[in-house]
């Protein structure tokens, strides 16, 4: 497992320009993914990946669970995290790569973020109930044990229980931004998220910039501002 300094050296030497396949943005069932951390290792091996980063929302809890499996499979596991942040009222995601999953400050802050998510989830569920949908926090948590529940988990719950015809419909009709059951939540400032990732020894990367719906000028300003705050990279390929 490498640290941030090693990552920098490898980057300068063109280490990531070879033919090895990697994936630096992967979620597990510790947040809104569909595979457990251990299952992700198996999937990565089958896909022929040389390395992958486990970057669950607001948690590094899956990293220790995947480490032994990754070692046995001969795959490099990059410890990571994805933080939902606020940039002048716009939600922007920052991925941290090579973070220390045991860093005390990171653990403390992510616990705060998770509590905010829990409060928000309860309000979303209440709003969905007000629309006549059959969902409870108890049922949602029972189907998503020991993980950070996101809107994607809620959307999948609605779909799997026949409340909507697709996950997309759940977002489009109910819980997407500006929809009737959407509930905002506290988000750490983008600049503070970058500082937190650095404090945990990590590399801060702007995630999927194409998804923010910004024009060229606004996107350039976002990148310029975050670079001034210490941003290390930009996600160029996202799927």
What are these regions (language model features)?
Residues 8-90, 174-177, 188-239:
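An N-terminally biased module of ancient metal coordination in phosphate/nucleic-acid-related enzymes
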Residues 71-220:
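Extended substrate/RNA-proximal surfaces in nucleic-acid metabolism proteins
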